[in-house]
Curated annotation (Swiss-Prot):
Pfam families: HgmA_C, HgmA_N. Keywords: Dioxygenase, Iron, Metal-binding, Oxidoreductase, Phenylalanine catabolism, Tyrosine catabolism. One of its GO terms (cellular component) is cytoplasm. It comes from the Bacteria. This is Homogentisate 1,2-dioxygenase. It comes from Rhizobium meliloti (strain 1021) (Ensifer meliloti). Pathway: Amino-acid degradation; L-phenylalanine degradation; acetoacetate and fumarate from L-phenylalanine: step 4/6. Disulfide bonds: none annotated.
Amino acid sequence: MLEKAEKQRRAGSGQQRAAGYMPGFGNDFETESLPGALPQGQNSPQKCNYGLYAEQLSGSPFTAPRGTNERSWLYRIRPSVRHTGRFRRVDYPHWKTAPHVGEHSLALGQLRWSPLPAPSEALDFLQGIRTMTTAGDALTQAGMAAHAYAFNADMVDDYFFNADGELLIVPETGAIQVFTELGRMDVEPSEICLIPRGMMFKVTRLGEEKVWRGYICENYGAKFTLPDRGPIGANCLANPRDFKTPVAAYEDKETPCRVQVKWCGSFHMVEIGHSPLDVVAWHGNYAPYKYDLKTFSPVGAILFDHPDPSIFTVLTAPSGEEGTANVDFVIFPPRWLVAEHTFRPPWYHRNIMSEFMGLIYGRYDAKEEGFVPGGMSLHNMMLAHGPDFSGFEKASNGELKPVKLDNTMAFMFETRFPQQLTTFAAELDTLQDDYMDCWSGLERKFDGTPGIK
């Protein structure tokens, strides 16, 4: 179905690209959609082939260490200065930026929501974004925002880039095509994609759904990278070869288009007469990518006890403090549970980090009821959380034979900063007022006498 939709979209669209993706994480890639469009041996020829313009897109300061220095050279039909003009302010009232504290009366506590409802009117990807929490300060490039999205229309002649941070998109319902300056990515539920800070893109729908829904982590800080494996060694977790960067693709059309920008928390728009997705060739290491979460190779306890959830980290955005993330992206994928004489679900916990969770499909082992695909939960710093009553009883009394935890994919955006709730999130109809009742059955068992109770 996706292949058919893709062919229909490409027919007569003026879009050009080679087939496929390039594997690897942080590689220095090179790709061209027309033969000879990519200069060899230098970055900025006096005149580029095909009459293209050479332009550098920098994702780090020029003097950043080699290991964190990011830039790509783009060879495009027009330079980006032609994709701008006199901007005017526009409003996306449901997209908030840190620092932001919503004006609401909702008391502090552990929170959970059912999925966003399907939109009752036509909304494209940008119009469908709803900020749930913000953390840190975008102006100092620290922190993040957690968004949910639900949309039902394509960005046809609308284009967008975010100067405030990179966007990690996690589809839950409905596959999407993310067409960036550097190429196109088809992203299905159970896959993620990342769009670097400042990179132009648009989002269209793939397949046939009533709603396209998912989650976004807007990372204001240092870019996401792979976590160090430490004693785990050279393999497992997210392997670099499973990350896919798109090959060059461009859109050559002369039609009224709108370029929209998020800059320091405000939104701006300019009208131009052509598509800005006009990069015919490029090389460099500042690039978008997608990743299939099903290729994550989990590690865990193979004798007793439950390890820390950091072993499930897919990507981490470091802060200035060693071992402390600005934001981590963590998943809880299918895996075998084999620990002996052990309470196998995640333990009860209070944490210096703040956790925003979502469920892509299946059930989450610590919350088998109430936490459904498309739903969300928020456990802020130092607020207690853990398995619900039924999960505790099941895990405490079940036979400890090897069990495969299958058909599940939950995730977490975890940050060192407290996550401030937006007014939208506090007043959302899908907020579960009875969430904390899930622990009400956890009664006192202690009676002062020895023995298992």
